[in-house]
Amino acid sequence: MLKRKTVAIKDVYVPVKRRQTLDSNKVEALAESILAKGQEAPILVREDGTRFVLVEGLHRLEACRALGETTVSAYLVQARQH
């Protein structure tokens, strides 16, 4: 079962490859939705030392950041072994 927690946005690292897929129109639409309904779906992160690495939810993360939020709801997932 996934562990849900609130994490500081500043502690979430977004890998460069993932950051390149950012769509500002999606961020804007999600920000409007979050204002109206709150954050309905947590992002997915994995622990990496003292920070969290984003696994899924870039647009949700950036929408929360754009709204001036300092924390985001997240599910903590296990890192995949390669």
Task: Label each residue range with its predicted role.
Residues 1-78:
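Short, charged/polar connector segments at secondary-structure boundaries
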Residues 81-82:
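Short, charged recognition helix plus adjacent turn
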